[in-house]
Amino acid sequence: NRNKIENEYFESNDEFNSKCIPILYKEVNYNFIYERIKKYDPDVMIVFGSSIIKEPLLSLSKKNKFLNLHLGLSPYYKGNATNFWPFINNELEFLGSTILHIDSGIDTGDIITHVRPKIEKNDNVHTIGCKIIQESAKKMGMILNLIKENKEINRIPQWNTKNEKIYKLKDFNQGILEDYLNKIENGIVQKFLLEEEEKF
């Protein structure tokens, strides 16, 4: 189901259009990666779906030019699968992504912008995820244009919230998946849309 949905949203998007350095997820903080990127001296670096970036790689950050696309709304949802957990917690208002300046924490950098999807009645975690990625890519393009034009980009420090949640891969299990499927079957998305409609 997931592959089918991703193919609908991202047909013919299994290759990069530009030259890139292939880096395996677990290798991101290895010294040979640091040396290679240092030699390459990129104008801008964007992290998406990586583990935490550590020193010395973090030190290559140029002012406002090391960005992280986090698929979750920081500071509320951080860590892993952060557009899955709002379904479990009945908090669909926290679906989205955050484009932020990278730092050494888990999705804790200063915020550039949030991206929110248009939620529709037949959506699920996969369709929502694809919509968020599409909208985030458009927004990232706009931010890169600002950087290219030497314009300032937002730098909003994350605020304290008692609702902050940090999820790890180990939090995901069979019971949680069954809970998600039950919520979809019982109309969590439709109920959310109805509640949103009633606010206006």
Where on the chain are the PLM-derived regions?
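One-carbon transfer enzymes
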Residues: 1-200
